[in-house]
């Protein structure tokens, strides 16, 4: 790892992922190289089935590459056991998905505080931090509402707060506005960009929305298993 790579929040080199089913082998990703700097906001676009979600899973340590390296906050994932990888994810990364994945039996406050509780924070400190973030995303009147009592946009705002509650170095977002109408999609995306600037948390966002992607610092296209940087249409 060189000095430039040491400064990166997250980077990968020569990343590949192959899936095998019997005699059939499909190489979804090949020779993927990517580096994410502190405070940077990067969008990844590409056709359905191009491997965008697979790439995020590898970058987040949720899957293991067929070859190549992934480094998060200066640590090589290949050298960590499952417990260590889980701790690193909890400390250094936040995740936002197309489906909010909030626990239905928990309130917005409890869902948002959960990553801090898993990390060992006291209930009082976890809830204090969760309240502050929920207020920032506009949910100060929804602390005690469960996901079923929230609108789609409110659920995704709670998911954004949950992803940021541990002060991660980087947030990985997989189609975070994919289930929202245009108005809510633009509001949630703007919220994410605002928090990127305010908190200094790097963002890697997979999206099909070219209009939203164009608002980020850098747009990469996943094509034929490789990441390329091309002008937007």
UniProtKB/Swiss-Prot annotation:
InterPro entries: AAA+_ATPase, ABC_transporter-like_ATP-bd, ABC_transporter-like_CS, ABC_transpr_LolD-like, LolD_lipo_ATP-bd, MacB-like_ATP-bd, P-loop_NTPase. The lineage of its organism: Bacteria, Pseudomonadati, Pseudomonadota, Gammaproteobacteria, Chromatiales. Its main location: membrane. Part of the ABC transporter complex LolCDE involved in the translocation of mature outer membrane-directed lipoproteins, from the inner membrane to the periplasmic chaperone, LolA. Responsible for the formation of the LolA-lipoprotein complex in an ATP-dependent manner. It comes from Nitrosococcus oceani (strain ATCC 19707 / BCRC 17464 / JCM 30415 / NCIMB 11848 / C-107). Keywords: ATP-binding, Cell inner membrane, Cell membrane, Membrane, Nucleotide-binding, Translocase, Transport. This is Lipoprotein-releasing system ATP-binding protein LolD. GO terms for biological process: lipoprotein localization to outer membrane; protein localization to outer membrane. It is a peripheral membrane protein. It comes from the Bacteria. CDD domains: ABC_MJ0796_LolCDE_FtsE. NCBIfam families: LolD_lipo_ex. The gene is lolD. ATP binds at residues 46-53. One of its GO terms (cellular component) is plasma membrane. The complex is composed of two ATP-binding proteins (LolD) and two transmembrane proteins (LolC and LolE). GO terms for molecular function: ATP binding; ATP hydrolysis activity; transmembrane transporter activity. The keyword Cell membrane applies.
